[in-house]
Amino acid sequence: KILHGDSATNGFLQSARGAGALASALFIASLGRFSFKGRLLTIGSIAFPLFMLLFSFVTIVPLSLTVMLVTGSALILTMNIANSLVQTLVPDKLRGRVMGVYTLTFFGLFPLGALLMGVLAEHLGEAETIFICALVTLSVSLLIFFFVPAIKKLE
């Protein structure tokens, strides 16, 4: 409704997000072993909700595609580095259990979040729902940034 598009428009938006995700994954892979994972995690954790906030206001398809490209990149940057840090920082004897809980909470909460977003979108509207969820995500990211400064120093 907002972009006055159809299923093809949605396909292009998802493809833009996927292209950004692929670019980010290739970027991270090209770095090999690097010592600034915490800084990249912080950048991605703040960039993702910022660009989702921007997306909630955009009504032009080409600009939406650009925003989704950056959003996909920031999301994969965050997810990839968070996963890597969990696996490398947890002691060997606990890694399996910690990864099990991490995966369960990470992927297990997606459907609940999708349900909540669907209900909110039905009552408030799509753009408003994206705005609210992005604002909550940005707030949490900034709280972590300011109150857990050690994250920026993770290697």
Regions found by a protein language model. Name each.
Residues 1-155:
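C-terminal transmembrane bundle of multi-pass solute transporters/carriers
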